[in-house]
């Protein structure tokens, strides 16, 4: 199964990833079950064309129907709710192609672990740890793994943002890459080459 979409602001990136993966899975060897998650968090079984995933039109398909992951390891699969009837589609493995919140933060990995469904990618702890960039840097530092110089500005420090920016510019110099600690991909990332742009 391929799970795509999601509630994060990286929804479109997830659709692009899913399109690439689905397109490259050999259909003569594997049956691909597509589960899309709308921006509002609705889970839908999607039996339509992969091209509509790329454009975001997939959720308008009248053949979409509500779906959830079975939490019971004895009934491993996707529960599809259609016309008042429930069916389970057994699955062998999941490609969780969600990005950002509820996808790359360990949430989907935890759900799949609970359900006993194997999946591609890192596990819950690694995903959760790596979603928070400051936490990742601290872990790497503890293990003596070199990373780029970095500084964290906390919510409390935002009231003194000018002083924080001045201190960071003095310690690190320019140019700087500014990134939210808890966003995936390049969401919210900016380039600062001066105190004003920082």
Feature locations, PLM:
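Active-site nucleotide/adenylate-binding loops and adjacent lid/helix of ATP-dependent enzymes
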Residues: 1-3, 8-9, 16-19, 84-88, ...
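Hydrophobic, aliphatic-enriched repeat segments that assemble into extended interaction scaffolds
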Residues: 1-3, 30-33
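Residues at helix C-cap/C′ positions in short coil/turn segments immediately following an alpha-helix
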Residues: 28-29, 172
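Intrinsically disordered, low-complexity regions enriched in small/polar residues
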Residues: 6, 32, 47-48, 121, ...
């Amino acid at each position: 199964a391929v799970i795509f979409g999601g509630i994060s602001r990286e929804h479109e990136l997830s659709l692009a990833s899913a399109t690439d993966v689905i397109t490259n899975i050999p259909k003569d060897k594997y049956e691909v079950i597509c589960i899309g998650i709308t921006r509002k968090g609705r889970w839908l079984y999607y039996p339509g064309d992969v091209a509509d995933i790329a454009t975001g039109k997939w959720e308008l398909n009248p053949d979409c129907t509500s779906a959830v992951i079975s939490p019971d390891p004895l009934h491993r699969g996707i529960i599809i709710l259609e016309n008042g009837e429930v069916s389970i589609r057994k699955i062998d493995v999941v490609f969780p192609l969600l990005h950002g919140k509820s996808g790359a933060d360990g949430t989907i990995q935890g759900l799949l672990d609970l359900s006993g469904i194997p999946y591609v990618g890192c596990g819950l702890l690694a995903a959760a740890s790596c979603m928070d960039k400051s936490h990742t840097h601290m872990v790497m530092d503890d293990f003596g793994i070199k990373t780029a110089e970095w500084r964290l500005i906390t919510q409390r420090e935002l009231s003194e943002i000018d002083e924080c920016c001045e201190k960071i510019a003095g310690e690190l110099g320019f140019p700087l890459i500014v990134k939210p600690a808890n966003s995936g991909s390049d969401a919210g990332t900016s380039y600062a080459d001066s105190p004003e742009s920082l």
